[in-house]
């Protein structure tokens, strides 16, 4: 009788434990399904619902279609892919392939392309033959994502200011890569240097960049340079290797599957959700990792900014900091505790305070755009994509031009 009772208790306990595991993994599966739908897939759903034409080709499909049509002059944008592509090479590349028809991106339903300049940036090549009145540095928001060149911030600023605008923006750049890009390609005399800070990812990008020795050396050695202006043939060859690796990797899909599977087995999303929802009272993950920032990361950022301002001062240039809020900041459906981009908005007061203490010129885009009394989400493709649409980029260019005229 006693043995029977013990067996029954063990059986019940086993059922409870198994049920708990099943419930937890079902919850992880629910969160995975909820968060795995990409912005692209969501945009396509909205486009279909509103009967808006949408080019559903991925960048890989677009590129391979061009290769099939023997259009070898078309290349995908590379930029910082050198940091994530497993190539045994210590080369540094800050742009795309020079003088090429470049596949950019698609957020509004159509693919955008541009003819890269002599150094691989998104400019008319003639900008390099004139005085550099205005120099833009930043990530994809500056690069021109994802609109035609004439509708980008740089394109509209050329139109409004009637000045020569050099766009050194590149997708996925963080603050350190922007600093390096300025030192390699933008250190001209008597320019207006405009640095764009992207609230959604710049601090996280900086924390990743600072770990790369070939990037960190630019901060450690004041006069260090790779003289990339004189190595275009070399960097073009490196960029081509990156493209061949990324777009012909037959094991990429399997690698992504393994990565997602490990994510699932570790209950990553469930642990993250519970940790953030309880403000760390139930601590299943390091909450600092989820925040993506701490006192140290801000100190790194401020140190980099000081060095960048010092570099511009050496060239008798005027430095302007542009604070770009994340789209998620305006989306009421995004929970600040669960979204890293929205969470990063909590850093803003400290950043603005630093700028004011250091007497650094700055433009707060949220403050300026709010004066327009418009629905901010209307400035983003389908109200969900990461970059400003052409109307949003035009407004940003107007704001910057007005600020410059008041200097």
Go through each PLM region and give its residues.
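Hydrophobic membrane-insertion alpha-helices, especially the h-region
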Residues: 11-28
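Histidine-centered active-site loop/cap adjacent to the catalytic His
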Residues: 31-35, 261, 361, 382-407
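Membrane/wall-proximal cationic-aromatic binding patches
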Residues: 39-159, 283, 369-383
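Serine-dependent acyl-ester chemistry module
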Residues: 40, 198-352, 360, 365-371
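Conserved SGNH/GDSL esterase-like catalytic core that processes O-acyl groups on lipids
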Residues: 134, 143-226
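Loop/turn elements at helix/coil->beta-strand transitions in domains of secreted/extracellular proteins
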Residues: 162-164, 188-193, 313-320, 358-360
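Short, amphipathic alpha-helical "lid/cap" segments that border enzyme active or binding sites
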Residues: 175, 179, 298, 302, ...
């Amino acid at each position: 009788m006693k043995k029977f009772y013990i067996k029954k208790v063990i059986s019940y306990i086993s059922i409870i434990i198994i049920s708990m595991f099943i419930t937890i993994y079902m919850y992880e599966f629910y969160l995975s399904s909820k968060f795995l739908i990409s912005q692209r897939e969501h945009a396509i759903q909205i486009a279909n619902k509103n009967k808006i034409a949408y080019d559903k080709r991925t960048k890989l499909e677009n590129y391979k279609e061009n290769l099939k049509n023997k259009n070898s002059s078309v290349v995908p944008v590379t930029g910082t892919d050198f940091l994530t592509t497993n190539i045994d090479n210590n080369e540094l590349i800050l742009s795309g392939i020079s003088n090429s028809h470049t596949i950019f991106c698609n957020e509004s339903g159509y693919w955008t392309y541009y003819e890269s300049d002599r150094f691989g940036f998104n400019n008319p090549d003639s900008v390099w033959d004139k005085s550099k009145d205005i120099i833009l540095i930043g990530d994809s928001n500056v690069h021109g994502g994802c609109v035609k060149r004439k509708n980008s911030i740089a394109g509209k600023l050329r139109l409004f200011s009637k000045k020569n605008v050099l766009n050194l923006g590149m997708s996925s750049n963080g603050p350190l890569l922007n600093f390096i890009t300025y030192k390699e390609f933008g250190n001209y005399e008597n320019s207006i240097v405009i640095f764009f800070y992207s609230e959604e990812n710049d601090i996280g990008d900086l924390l990743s960049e600072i770990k790369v020795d070939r990037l960190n050396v630019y901060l450690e050695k004041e006069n260090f340079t790779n003289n990339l202006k004189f190595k275009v043939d070399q960097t073009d060859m490196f960029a081509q290797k990156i493209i061949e690796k990324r777009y012909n990797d037959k094991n990429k899909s399997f690698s992504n599957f393994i990565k997602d599977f490990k994510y699932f087995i570790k209950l990553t999303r469930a642990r993250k959700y519970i940790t953030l929802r309880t403000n760390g009272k139930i601590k299943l993950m390091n909450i600092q990792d989820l925040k993506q920032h701490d006192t140290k990361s801000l100190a790194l950022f401020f140190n980099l900014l000081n060095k960048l301002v010092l570099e511009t001062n050496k060239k008798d240039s005027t430095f302007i900091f542009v604070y770009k809020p994340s789209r998620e900041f305006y989306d009421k459906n995004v929970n600040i505790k669960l979204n890293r981009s929205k969470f990063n908005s909590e850093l803003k007061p400290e950043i603005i305070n630093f700028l004011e203490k250091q007497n650094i010129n700055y433009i707060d885009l949220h403050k300026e755009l709010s004066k327009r009394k418009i629905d901010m989400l209307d400035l983003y493709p389908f109200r969900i994509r990461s970059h400003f649409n052409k109307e949003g980029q035009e407004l940003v260019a107007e704001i910057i031009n007005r600020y410059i005229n008041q200097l």
